[in-house]
Regions:
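C-terminal cap/substrate-recognition subdomain and adjoining C-terminal extension
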Residues: 49, 53-138
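Alpha-helical substrate-recognition element adjacent to the catalytic core
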Residues: 1-76
């Protein structure tokens, strides 16, 4: 079992990756990790899940947004996103910008390898993330 943690801005929206590649990435995640995928974004903080509205406003297909809303679980965190990570289970965290203090928490837990850093300017980034997830399996 592996947890997947998803940021939105710079990862799924506001990125150079074509929408079709982002859809492929999300479809793969929903298919392979339906019970262990979590939002780790400012749009879902303190358990308040505003992700579906934000994704719809930013052009993700409505049927996919509905599936994401039903499947991807909200997280509870206040200051650092790492507060929501379960370090007892292997994970992949897709994010574009980690805070220095979040990196320090990852180092404390020897979990730096759990982060897949996304570059929103790279139009191949969603494909690279998909290839990475496929390479590590579940």
């Amino acid at each position: 079992m592996m947890n997947i943690y998803l940021d939105i801005d710079g990862v799924l929206v506001g990125t150079a990756s074509p929408m079709s590649d982002i859809v492929d990435l999300l479809e793969y995640i929903l298919e392979r990790f339906p019970h262990s995928t979590y939002w780790l974004t400012t749009h879902c903080r303190w358990g308040s899940n505003q992700c579906a509205q934000w994704l719809k406003q930013n052009g993700l297909p409505k049927p996919l947004v509905c599936r994401l809303h039903r499947t991807v679980r909200p997280t509870h965190w206040q200051t650092l996103k790492t507060e929501a990570i379960d370090f007892s289970i292997p994970f992949v965290w897709l994010d574009d910008a980690l805070l220095y203090s979040e990196r320090a928490v990852l180092r404390q837990h020897h979990a730096q390898d759990g982060v897949f850093l996304m570059d929103p300017r790279d139009d191949q980034m969603a494909l690279k993330a998909l290839a990475y997830l496929k390479s590590i399996g579940d």
